């Protein structure tokens, strides 16, 4: 059996309409993606914590999966009639039957961060069994560790973590930074997130890596200060959380902030200068790592 993948260019004001209508017309699935994803023009969507979702991207691709027997011309006519959109720009691709689990796994290879620090999919042999290998299951939510901000934070941790230092990973997601800190020799390691599924993912991944770390929902986080605070989250959230992250860092402690675009770096850095002596920013592609020392 085969399928047809239909990709339609869409604006921010019609992408959801197209996606919903395609499902009503019998599509097996429909999704919306940033048309500029994984390019320098990628458009992150930011919103203040607690605010409603700010919307979708300005330029989108709506992808629908259709049965191979679908009459594409008739479908597009019905789609146009139902939405009032007549100027579709689209492309199609035939997708053959295959072992989807194996196909998905083949997309993820071990990622070398630096030296012998690796991110290794759980089903893959480690390129260096004696290296510092962080085992992740990319089938879980909260990322695979391939994003530039993850690279920036992991490389910084490798330079900064000393034996028995305490580390707070705020916005732990998959737990990758907390797990790395523990494997790099940190003592007390705590991860925190606002999403219960992130906590479950972090606990699972920590168990996979046989490391001892504690994970809490933000509302349940015990008090205390840390030698190192790292937060790889949205820049808007970093701005709001600055006082809390400053309280979590002991005097002389270190902080690392990412999830920040180049054009947002000055604004975020200025906020944290109230509590930290900020270092020169480090860049990777269009992303920034900000670090500093607690006064």
From Swiss-Prot:
Q: Extract the coiled-coil ranges from the record.
A: none
Superkingdom classification of source:
Bacteria
Family listed: Belongs to the methyltransferase superfamily. PrmA family.
Stored NCBIfam families: prmA
The protein's role, per its UniProt record: Methylates ribosomal protein L11.
What EC number(s) does the entry state? 2.1.1.-
UniProt main location, coarse: cytoplasm
GO MF, any single term: protein-lysine N-methyltransferase activity
Catalysed reaction per UniProt? Answer: L-lysyl-[protein] + 3 S-adenosyl-L-methionine = N(6),N(6),N(6)-trimethyl-L-lysyl-[protein] + 3 S-adenosyl-L-homocysteine + 3 H(+)
Q: What is this protein called?
A: Ribosomal protein L11 methyltransferase
- Intrachain S-S bonds: none
Mind telling me which InterPro entries this protein's record contains?
Ribosomal_L11_MeTrfase_PrmA (IPR050078), Ribosomal_PrmA_MeTrfase (IPR004498), SAM-dependent_MTases_sf (IPR029063)
How would you classify this enzyme at the top EC level? Answer: transferase
Gene Ontology terms: biological process: methylation
Q: Where in the cell is it found?
A: Cytoplasm
Q: Name the residues that bind S-adenosyl-L-methionine.
A: 150, 171, 193, 232
Which UniProt key words apply to this protein? Answer: Cytoplasm, Methyltransferase, S-adenosyl-L-methionine, Transferase
GO CC annotation, single: cytosol
């Amino acid at each position: 059996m085969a399928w047809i993948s239909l990709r339609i260019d869409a604006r921010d004001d019609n992408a959801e309409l197209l996606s919903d209508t395609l499902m009503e017309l019998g599509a097996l699935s429909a999704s919306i993606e940033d048309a500029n994803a994984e390019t320098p023009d990628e458009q992150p969507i930011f919103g203040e914590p607690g605010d409603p979702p700010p919307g979708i991207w300005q330029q989108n691709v709506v992808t629908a999966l259709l049965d191979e027997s679908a009459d594409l011309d008739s479908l597009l006519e019905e789609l146009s009639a139902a939405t009032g959109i007549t100027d579709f720009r689209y492309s199609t691709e035939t997708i053959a039957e295959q072992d989807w689990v194996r196909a998905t796994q083949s997309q993820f290879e071990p990622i070398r961060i630096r030296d012998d620090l690796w991110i290794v999919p759980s089903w893959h042999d480690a390129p260096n069994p004696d290296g510092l290998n962080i085992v992740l299951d990319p089938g879980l939510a909260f990322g695979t560790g391939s994003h530039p901000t993850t690279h920036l934070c992991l490389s910084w941790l490798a330079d900064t973590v000393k034996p028995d230092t305490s580390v707070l990973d705020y916005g732990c997601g998959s737990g990758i930074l907390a797990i790395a800190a523990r494997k790099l020799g940190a003592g007390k390691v705590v991860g925190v997130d606002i999403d219960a599924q992130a906590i479950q993912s972090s606990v699972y991944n920590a168990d996979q890596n046989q490391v001892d770390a504690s994970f809490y929902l933000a509302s349940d986080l015990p008090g205390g200060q840390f030698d190192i605070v790292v937060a790889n989250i949205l820049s808007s959230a970093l701005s709001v959380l600055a006082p809390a992250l400053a309280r979590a860092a002991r005097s002389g402690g270190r902080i690392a902030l990412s999830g920040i675009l180049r054009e947002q770096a000055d604004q975020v850095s200025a906020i944290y200068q109230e509590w930290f002596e900020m270092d020169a920013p480090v860049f990777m592609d269009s992303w920034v790592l900000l670090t500093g020392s607690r006064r």
